[in-house]
Amino acid sequence: MRNTVQGKDGFGLGDGFMKPGQELVMAGYTGFSGTLLIGERKREILGKHFAPGFLRSLEEGERFSTEQWMKHELEAGNSPVTAYKFAGEGGVFAALWNLPGVFHAGIDVELRRFPVKQITVEFCELFGLNPYRLYSGNCLLMAAEGGGALVRRLRREGIPAEVVGWVTEGLGRQVGHGG
């Protein structure tokens, strides 16, 4: 399976593929790792704008690991995932740019389909940040056959997931806002 690995020489290639018609699945909450960091570093400012109960939701953290899930998938050897990219730095926008770039593939995605927590939206509005560019360390973009079935599997394992788009012909990257 081919993934994108950021190393000292840029992105490396492994086995795998992306082809038109495949679905793009996002697992994990968009920007939530960055939200947790903001919560740690800006607690005093946040306390002036949000109720304590709302901020306590940060204490739950992330109860799942997309990295561990993907590791298990690779070990099992029967995954519908043919290519993947952990979002991390640069957020889901970076993953949307980098993954199809490795395969010279196009994509068509809808931002409103991405799993995102309300607390992330609120923090981004307060600090003028873009949730799709916010650090997304526990977020995974995957190309797969049968994306709907993959989403159901992920959800059964407690990982939020959605089909967010499709692989298309050509090199274009269409990003819609669902409006």
Report residues per predicted region.
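Helix-biased detector of long, well-ordered alpha-helical tracts
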Residues: 1-179
